[in-house]
Swiss-Prot record:
Belongs to the TRAFAC class translation factor GTPase superfamily. Classic translation factor GTPase family. EF-G/EF-2 subfamily. It is found in: Cytoplasm. This is Elongation factor G. GTP binds at residues 17-24, 88-92, 142-145. Catalyzes the GTP-dependent ribosomal translocation step during translation elongation. During this step, the ribosome changes from the pre-translocational (PRE) to the post-translocational (POST) state as the newly formed A-site-bound peptidyl-tRNA and P-site-bound deacylated tRNA move to the P and E sites, respectively. Catalyzes the coordinated movement of the two tRNA molecules, the mRNA and conformational changes in the ribosome. It comes from Thiobacillus denitrificans (strain ATCC 25259 / T1). One of its GO terms (biological process) is ribosome disassembly. The keyword NADP does not apply. Keywords: Cytoplasm, Elongation factor, GTP-binding, Nucleotide-binding, Protein biosynthesis. GO terms for molecular function: GTP binding; GTPase activity; guanosine tetraphosphate binding; translation elongation factor activity.
Amino acid sequence: MARTTPIERYRNIGISAHIDAGKTTTTERILFYTGKSHKIGEVHDGAATMDWMEQEQERGITITSAATTCFWKGMDGKFPEHRINIIDTPGHVDFTIEVERSMRVLDGACMVYCAVGGVQPQSETVWRQANKYGVPRLAFVNKMDRSGADFFKVYEQMRARLKANPVPIQVPIGAEDKFEGVVDLVKMKAIYWDDASQGMKFDLRDIPANLVDTCKKWREAMLEAAAESSEELMNKYLEEGDLPEADIIAALRARTIASEIVPMMCGTAFKNKGVQAMLDKVIELMPAPTDIPPVKGELENGEAGERQATDEEKFSALAFKVATDPYVGQLIFFRVYSGVVNSGDTIYNPVKGRKERIGRILQMHANQREEIKEVRAGDIAAAVGLKDVTTGDTLCDLNAPITLERMEFPEPVIHVAVEPKTKADQEKMGIALGRLAQEDPSFRVRTDEESGQTIISGMGELHLEILVDRMKREFGVEANVGAPQVAYREAIRKEVEQEGKHAKQSGGKGQYGHVWIKMGPNEAGKGFEFIDAIKGGTVPREFIPAVEKGLREALNNGVLAGFPVVDVKVTLFDGSYHDVDSSELAFKLAAILAFKDGMRKASPVLLEPMMAVEVETPEDYMGDVMGDLNRRRGIIQGMDDAAGIKLVKAEVPLAEMFGYSTDLRSMSQGRATYSMEFKHYSEAPKSVAEAIIAKK
């Protein structure tokens, strides 16, 4: 089967934004205009096509990023048909992991901002993730019809808060209830959409007289940004004072793909204005899979390799999401970087070292699906029948293994104990939790050794609440949930040398292991580092892995309160052995003893997770909010003003933030909102640490 759309006409984009910027509505409109959904789905009435889990429709927030394919020929049909694969990403900070994984497989992103709220905390997080993966971006300022809408304020915020280089390529005609359309600065024409056809039809008119000067000013800024793409274009611009349309588009495209500029557009998705023009810009300015550097990975021999985005290249793909589907079981969403794969093919997963057979391949449209026979470079699809694939795994040709760069997933910061309500739920709960953990790498499940309880960990209260809810709905498991607990850590502050000796001589073969270690603090976030500095075989080669294993085991339970120990550097520098009595077990036990004794002397401290908290509050409640954050041991980092709303930034220990949403609601009569994300671990004050240790 030949390719239906050339790869140059593919656009793999994400739509990403803060919670209420109107991202799902924007995606719905895209599906409507591209003819994939015949009736517009409104989030307000819980019918949005993209939000397909029951909970999303109830809560009106997007939890899983659904992938959808649609086709577009331009507002006036001027382009050959382009294929746009859209990944809708969640805006709630507890689901940052979803954003992170979709960023990894996108070629470009459309950042949706609310014209009133502007750049909000989650927007900054998403921006950082897009920077990390080098994703080119467009900005769409939505909700221009809302009171307080201000396109240029969002422009300033993008510069100040995101340190971005936004370039408006449209100017709004009016704002709030007077918002009528946009001026296209490339064509210098005003675009008005027709309400009766829900924006399917439009008119091009002259620019309203009161906007001519504004448009000239912003067009000049846009031309300068375009001209900076090359010396030759700059000279042409300086000589002629203007540039032809084709040159402007080509130059803006080159600079957007290089992540040097972020073209800005505006509209109101809800009122069917602006999304159509944004789609045109996705085609004109966003990269095709062939416009970005070839994907990099590691070959079987450990050397660096890459794969070109062509059908002739060997097959390679990245699994970026695992979802359980009520009809077909487990779906693995994957992005094909190179080559072709057919349903029924056997492929290789180098991360797990397993062969897998692809049963069926489905092209997704929100939660409707179409079965297809093959997928090619640039495609995003879902596979059924893969047995052991986790998010971030590579799928590739059996005869040309390559492991694509893996994704990094954050460590969970909050955990709760869950207990099945009945004996019958016990086994089902184990299966359900295993499934959910496979779908979501930021969710962990373990059994507490002391209490025998099942502990689940995640990125925040909402994250865990939704997972427990899914357990009930999708797997029919009723569970009791304990109070949330903070994931504390332990660390050391001093460098010490310590001996560890395990010797038992009781007739027959004894046990003998003896080590000297030097242990000290490692850089924050570096984790555990083991250095083998044995000279002259005082500890034989074959026992050194056992020493490291013992140390890693000892890290699981610190000496203060049994929390995991982080950021420690341990050097094994001396020891002794016995020809007959030494064994791996003896050296492992000696290492554990040395670590425990050494840690007691190395000024152990308790670390607690600190959260970056941003509160938006009307001025009247400012005093209460600040006072309350101080009481919660918060450190105020800064304050900002936005249209009569005060923005307070603080760093607060997670332990003090439980139940904050309820307290904030009552303190501000429901008018203040907040967002919070994990920042880093820091040393808990002495009084706090003592109280936690005493509880243990």
